[in-house]
């Protein structure tokens, strides 16, 4: 059956729009002009724009530039969109105008047409709400779109990423307590080093994550000042007095986050340094997670031909040709996510540096990469915690064998017999394939009782008490 269309008008003239679509002429032009790739504008960003539209309607009504009836029409439409009733009405590609204008107008048009439908008017009639004159009143894409990126980024970090990160930290904390008396061989340069406990080793992972969490939390402070009320370039043209402060208060109330009106709107409309900074903190979290999963797959490598000090949960077969093979797939998935985050950070850095004069025209890319990064990190942290980290168990036999055979235990003798003699003991033990105690006795440097008293792995970890 052939699709039916209605005719809509905008400043460019007439255009056919699918009869059932709630979007209008400008959205339809964007669908035609930017049929690029398959990445759609994230719904999280759409919902943040809708939050702005609702808050703007409330403030515009309060300041006397929008009547109460139209305010309620806007709020009703925004409520429907926020509840997920119209997700399919936001079909635009990320790869569009660098300001995000088409997406802002997509939201304006859908709100207008929801009101038209609810009031028995034809779609596209702009009655009772005009997309520009009423829904977009006191606003410009140039202040709405970056504000929406900031709001969506803050909400996604607070509601999704930080809770997952906290649970991951808590899981490592439980492992630290459980593993704190398991003494093992430390390794530097991938070679044997002095001993530490498995709990101490895990504490490094935990502290890396805590530092990343703290850095992320701190970066949010730069995202709370909003450019709303700056309109086109930061001067506030066509916005009533006090609109900027009032809308920031409304958004702070609805999001329960301390958003405020930016003192200098020119700066955060022409550049997006705060967003670039937050992206860099996501990258640092990825750097930490990459290091942690690399450690885990090194310590678990084997199970018989490698270190094999940790046993990771076995979740699925690992090879189509080698029976019984199981791979550290959660580590690999996390490593790929982290690699992707680092690449997305590079793109956001370049995008952030690409502004010209009063406008940065890479906003959709920044929005997409930030929200994609937060989503990937949140879900990867959850997956690795549930399917791997909670189930990790130490291989005590392997750990003990490696510790007993480590030549670096000799380090504790250095203050007693000196570096050169200690080196000779290690070399002798290695060359003759004997223990350090046997080499010490052979060279005549210490008796067995003194050796046992001084070369004490537990005391070397600082965990005697």
Curated annotation (Swiss-Prot):
Involved in the TCA cycle. Catalyzes the stereospecific interconversion of fumarate to L-malate. It is found in: Cytoplasm. HAMAP family: FumaraseC. Substrate binds at residues 99-101, 130-133, 140-142, 188, 320, 325-327. There are 2 substrate-binding sites: the catalytic A site, and the non-catalytic B site that may play a role in the transfer of substrate or product between the active site and the solvent. Alternatively, the B site may bind allosteric effectors. GO terms for biological process: fumarate metabolic process; malate metabolic process; tricarboxylic acid cycle. It comes from the Bacteria. Its EC number is 4.2.1.2. The active site is at residues 189, 319. Homotetramer. Gene3D superfamilies: Fumarase/aspartase (C-terminal domain), Fumarase/aspartase (Central domain), Fumarase/aspartase (N-terminal domain). Keywords: Cytoplasm, Lyase, Tricarboxylic acid cycle. It holds the Pfam family FumaraseC_C. The keyword Isomerase does not apply. The record marks 332 as: Important for catalytic activity. Belongs to the class-II fumarase/aspartase family. Fumarase subfamily. It comes from Prochlorococcus marinus (strain SARG / CCMP1375 / SS120). One of its GO terms (cellular component) is cytoplasm. It catalyses: (S)-malate = fumarate + H2O. Pathway: Carbohydrate metabolism; tricarboxylic acid cycle; (S)-malate from fumarate: step 1/1. One of its GO terms (molecular function) is fumarate hydratase activity. It is an enzyme of class 4 (lyase). This is Fumarate hydratase class II.
């Amino acid at each position: 059956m052939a699709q039916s269309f209605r005719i809509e008008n905008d400043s460019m003239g007439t255009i056919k729009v699918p009869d059932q679509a709630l979007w209008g002429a400008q959205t339809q032009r964007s669908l035609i002009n930017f049929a690029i790739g398959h990445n759609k504008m994230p719904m999280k960003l759409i919902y943040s724009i809708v939050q702005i539209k609702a808050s703007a309607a409330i403030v515009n009504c309060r300041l006397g530039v929008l009547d109460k009836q139209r305010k309620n029409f806007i709020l009703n439409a925004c409520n429907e969109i926020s509840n997920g009733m119209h997700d399919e009405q936001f079909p635009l590609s990320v790869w569009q105008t660098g300001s995000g204008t088409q997406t802002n107008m997509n939201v304006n048009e859908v709100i207008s047409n929801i009101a038209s439908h609810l009031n028995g008017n034809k779609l596209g009639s702009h009655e009772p709400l005009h997309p520009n004159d009423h829904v977009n009143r006191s606003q410009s894409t140039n202040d709405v779109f970056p504000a929406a990126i900031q709001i969506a980024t803050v909400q996604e970090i607070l509601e999704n990423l930080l809770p997952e990160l906290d649970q991951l930290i808590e899981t490592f904390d439980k492992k630290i307590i459980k593993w704190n008396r398991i003494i093992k061989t430390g390794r530097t340069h991938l070679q044997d080093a002095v001993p530490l406990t498995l709990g101490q080793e895990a504490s490094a992972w935990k502290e890396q994550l805590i530092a990343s969490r703290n850095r992320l939390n701190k970066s949010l402070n730069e995202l709370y000042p909003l450019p709303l009320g700056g309109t086109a370039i930061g001067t506030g043209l066509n916005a009533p007095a006090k609109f900027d402060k009032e809308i920031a208060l409304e958004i702070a109330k609805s999001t329960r986050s301390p958003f405020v009106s930016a003192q200098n709107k020119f700066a955060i409309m022409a550049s997006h340094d705060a967003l670039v900074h937050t992206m860099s903190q996501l990258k640092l979290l990825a750097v930490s997670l990459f290091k942690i999963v690399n450690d885990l797959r090194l310590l678990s490598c084997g199970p018989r031909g490698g270190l094999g000090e940790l046993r990771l949960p076995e979740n699925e077969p690992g090879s189509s040709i080698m029976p019984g093979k199981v791979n550290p797939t959660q580590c690999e998935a996390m490593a790929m996510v982290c690699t992707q985050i680092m690449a997305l950070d590079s793109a956001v850095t370049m995008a952030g540096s690409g502004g010209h004069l009063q406008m940065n025209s890479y906003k959709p890319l920044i929005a997409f990469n930030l929200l994609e990064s937060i989503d990937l990190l949140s879900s990867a942290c959850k997956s690795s915690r549930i399917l791997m980290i909670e189930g990790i168990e130490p291989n005590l036999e392997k750990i003990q064998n490696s510790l007993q055979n480590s030549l670096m235990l000799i380090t504790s003798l250095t203050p007693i017999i000196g570096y050169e003699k200690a080196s000779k003991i290690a070399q002798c033990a290695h060359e003759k394939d004997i223990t350090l105690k046997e080499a010490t006795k052979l060279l005549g440097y210490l008796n067995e009782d003194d050796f046992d008293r001084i070369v004490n792995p537990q005391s070397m970890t600082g965990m005697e008490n």
